[in-house]
């Protein structure tokens, strides 16, 4: 068992640890991995699979609802929406009230990170220096603690890995929405 808290980010897949949720990133770390894949043509129309390849979520920008991207569970029930206006608006059912995307992922003064407020707690999405397309999520006051989540682009796919602490804090849906916003190619400010 590794004592390096960052070693799990590069490890293989593990077994299922939360029943209906996908398997973890590694058996010992408990990390949960989701893969945004099957882009049609991009992250605004894609499938989000667990590490076992099973679809868990769907992201769709349907022509019948122009200007909207909807995030759905595997059973088809929507849980999140992005309304693409000049200043995009987001909402996550029962957890994030309707607000501007620029409020949900607030750009820092130095423009090096984005603050995400969820359940009255503040988190920071921080791009990693010298690591192209890797963004870590930390609690705002955490300093050097291991990241709660990581977004990494790998080829055409986008990987989202969450720690057990992130899952327990209810960050799965806000993190899924963050991936779509950050990789949409659209201005969110």
What are these regions, as identified by a protein language model?
Residues 39-126:
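Acidic, polar low-complexity intrinsically disordered regions
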Residues 1-46, 51, 55, 110-113, ...:
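Low-complexity or membrane-interfacial segments used for flexible interactions
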